[in-house]
């Protein structure tokens, strides 16, 4: 328990003692909130608890403050003052501040982290881009936000699992195989019509080139079906590996990579059976429909088409059912803003399956616009396609990119200034932070050069300068 928590408990104990001694009437004490005063002269902590509890006890705030202060048992306080109508200002003893700093140094990067709680179990799913091409800057924003959210929640003690949903089933993967196949045949001198919904990126050509470099025309005389089956697996494996490499370079890592393929057909059939059994799915015109209007959607949704092929919604229902079956108490999805209309139908499906739809929270990610020299950057100079995450990392660095991505609220469009992200000036917040860190490191370097060694038990009481004490208190204000 840190000093702040100890002080809050001491205030609660003082109020309880005042009530027991009938100095205050019976009543439920409001939540005790401590704040750091705007001026150092007003103490290390301040509380308006006396004013907050005046309407509970029906006693003047200053009188309540006096009863609290007179019964306060806190040996770590130098003094306590009552100000104005009933503010209480608390002043810590110097040795308490030094002890807290020693604990901070001992804790290192773990300082401020709260103890891990086993429950609730929370899952955060983010990025989940189709493995059909490189990640672009929009994916980068989702990756930075999701990663930061998971890190913060873990530091706050939450039991969090991060997950990437691999869309490795369905038409987009078929189109990936068709695209690689077309480029493979073209490179081997065959005339072929490029698929209508194929992927035109340079990365597809490079994949085909690598296949030829490794295996030559080995697949040329195979049937289209056999060749497409092989290319689907080769391309998927390569794209997924590249995707993981880009995310690792961005310092983004996942606990679970969940394959959509594992849901077909058993899990999809199972949720359809559940929904049919509980009356929340019906058959019409040969298709299976979810009664999503019963749960707030604007119309019922097709889950299985009349030709027996599942819609995207079918796999998503099975996937989210699987999440709850894994005993997660809270699901957080980070989706692109273009999925806005999809939120209601997935929540409706969860409610139809008997889950609490509020246990699924969807955060929508707005667009990112890149600017260079004041001009909107629409295409990559290198590829003529959308700017990829790896290109952004190469240009401004992973740290700067992550910093800029999470500087703005997720629900507002982000204008990413490439020049600012690279500038070495105080206008660039990343440079400002990195420069401060570099200056701190230089102090340790100069100490080493001067033969001054650090010790595990420094004499912190030598830190008496006003600026030093102010800096220590600033450090101790976290979290």
Language-model regions, residue ranges each:
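Short, charged, solvent-exposed linker or helix-capping segments at domain edges/interfaces
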Residues: 99-104
